[in-house]
Regions:
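Conserved ABC ATPase signature
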Residues: 129-133
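Catalytic Walker B motif of ABC-type/P-loop ATPase nucleotide-binding domains
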Residues: 154-158
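Hydrophobic anchor residue at the start of the ABC signature
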Residues: 143
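Walker A (P-loop) phosphate-binding loop of ABC-type ATPase nucleotide-binding domains
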Residues: 35-39
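Conserved ABC ATPase "signature" region
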Residues: 96, 100, 107-125
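A short, proline-enriched helix->beta-strand linker immediately N-terminal to the Walker B motif
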Residues: 148-152
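Conserved ABC transporter NBD signature motif
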Residues: 56-67, 71-76
Length: 175
């Protein structure tokens, strides 16, 4: 599903990721561990097509992310470290907007949104403005948007940041 070959990212003289190779098959979970600045987020940004590599290849569901980015991205649900939320939107409106961006068929949007909100336990705040939510709720809204479209691949950067201990357990179960 994800194949990384000789992936490198340099910023001038600084090498953030150096010759990284790995494969993740269907139903596998892979976690990156390392200190701050080790290249974990940089690697995830390259896999999702948000950041071009200096060299190497990234194959997502059979598509090279640099040659067929739109096809590769259709398979990915991404929760960045800081979710890019439109804070002046209500939770449900935002998720509906994202579902449209992800080309979720109109006939399936409401069901997928309800399912994602139920799974992340955010249904009770669906009519609230995102800017008025706690950090934990904002994180869960970001996670919910990653689930829309039923992606085959989830890439989650620090998915439990800002969550309380019970929420952390729930998210780990979901993963």
């Amino acid at each position: 599903m994800v194949e990384i070959n000789n992936l490198t990212k340099r910023y001038g003289n600084i090498t953030a990721v150096n010759n990284l190779s790995f494969t993740v098959s269907k139903n596998e979970i892979l976690g990156f561990l390392g200190p701050n600045g080790a290249g974990k987020t940089t690697t995830m940004n390259m896999i999702t097509g948000c950041l071009p590599p200096t060299s190497g290849t990234i194959i997502v569901n059979g598509f090279d992310i640099s040659k067929n980015p739109m096809e590769a991205k259709k398979s990915i649900g991404y929760l960045p470290e800081i979710p890019p939320l439109y804070t002046d939107m209500k939770v449900y409106e935002y998720l509906k907007f994202v579902a449209g961006l992800k080309s979720v068929p109109r006939s399936q949007r409401n069901e997928q949104i309800r399912d994602a909100m139920d799974r992340l336990k955010i249904s009770d705040v669906s009519k609230r403005l995102i800017k008025n939510l706690s950090k934990g709720y904002k994180q869960r809204v970001g996670f919910a948007q990653a689930l829309l479209g039923n992606p085959e691949i989830l890439i989650l950067d620090e998915p439990t940041v800002g969550l309380d201990p019970n929420q952390i357990l729930e998210v780990r179960k979901l993963i």
